[in-house]
Structures are given as structure tokens and as C-alpha cells.
């Protein structure tokens, strides 16, 4: 099983598999504790931000500005002066009560993303026994329990309980 995020590309390259993926810089911020507002994980259709309020009361939000691609700094993920304000503007559209919330810290990191934005999950026919799970672009934590269950079924039983054909690696092969 190769489930190594962006590093899957390098690992798979050692057996001649070229996975069309890139890494995407994403940033996050955390606020001081605030009064309880909600328990759900939130995200917007406009992709302004995503996040949740912790039991402690602080908010953890993430997002992007669209300018992260120019801020790669030789491979070191660093926070820009652009992204946190963009995330905050998105938050303010929905939660104006957070206008005075203080940001405690910000950080940046890499997410793995497939060329078509859809993760790869399943067997790789070119290498018998190889199972791939990569390209989740930050969604891996949210869907990890379901992915783990389906991977276990695939490895043990040779099949999954749901149809994962749309996630197969060979969708990137030329169709002649």
C-alpha cells in the first residue's frame, strides 16, 4: 500500500508508475478562545475557508488566496502575508461576530492533489499487489475512516463494499 501523500509520486516512480499529481500550498490559522458558536466542521461552496471551533473555544480555519503557487520558496511551505487576510474576509461574510477575534498563529503545509482533483484509490494493474491511496488534497483526515475500511476490504477480500472505479489509477491512461 502506498498512501504517502505527495511523496507517493516519488515512491511510485521507483516502480515506473507516473502519478499525475502536484503539491498545493495551504495555510491555516488558529484564534484565541471565543464563546461557543458551533460544533460542526464548516466549509463554503466558494471555498473561502473551512474550519471548526475546538472544545477549548478557539477556531481553526484554513484556506487559500489563489496566490500560493508563487510562494513556494524552494519547497519550504511558508505562510504568506496574503492568505490569512483572505481567509478572514471569507469568515467575516458568515460570522461577523468574529471580527475582533485575535489570531494566535498561522502555519502552512503541503497537500497532495491529483491533476483532475480526484483522489486515487485502488489496485495498480502494472504492479501486481500494489494498492494506491493518494491525492486527497486535505480531505484525507475527514474521509480516512471510510478510506481505511475500503482499503482493508480491498486488500483482504479483493473487493470493496462500494464502487471505487471512478477513483482508479488507470483513468489517467490514454484511451485508444
Residue spans of the language-model regions?
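C-terminal lid/capping helical subdomain adjacent to the catalytic/cofactor pocket in oxidative enzymes
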Residues: 125-176
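A short alpha-helix-loop-beta-strand transition element characteristic
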Residues: 19-21, 100, 158-164
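Active-site lid/adjacent beta-loop-alpha segment flanking the redox-cofactor pocket in flavoenzymes
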Residues: 33-129
Amino acid at each position: 500500500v502506498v498512501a504517502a501523500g505527495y511523496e507517493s509520486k516519488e515512491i511510485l516512480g521507483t516502480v515506473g508508475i507516473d502519478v499525475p499529481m502536484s503539491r498545493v500550498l495551504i495555510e491555516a490559522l488558529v484564534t484565541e478562545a471565543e464563546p461557543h458558536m458551533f460544533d460542526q466542521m464548516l466549509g463554503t461552496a466558494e471555498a473561502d475557508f473551512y474550519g471548526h471551533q475546538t472544545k477549548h473555544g478557539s477556531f481553526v480555519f484554513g484556506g487559500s488566496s489563489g496566490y500560493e503557487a508563487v510562494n513556494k520558496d524552494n519547497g519550504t511551505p511558508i505562510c504568506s502575508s496574503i492568505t490569512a487576510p483572505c481567509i478572514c474576509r471569507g469568515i467575516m461574510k458568515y460570522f461577523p461576530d468574529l471580527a475582533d477575534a485575535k489570531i494566535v498563529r498561522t502555519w502552512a503545509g503541503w497537500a497532495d492533489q491529483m491533476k483532475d482533483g480526484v483522489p486515487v484509490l485502488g489496485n495498480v494493474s502494472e504492479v501486481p499487489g500494489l494498492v494506491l491511496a493518494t491525492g486527497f488534497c486535505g480531505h484525507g483526515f475527514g474521509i480516512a475512516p471510510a478510506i481505511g475500511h475500503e482499503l482493508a476490504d480491498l486488500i483482504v477480500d479483493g473487493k470493496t463494499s462500494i464502487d471505487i472505479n471512478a477513483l482508479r489509477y488507470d483513468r489517467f491512461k490514454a484511451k485508444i
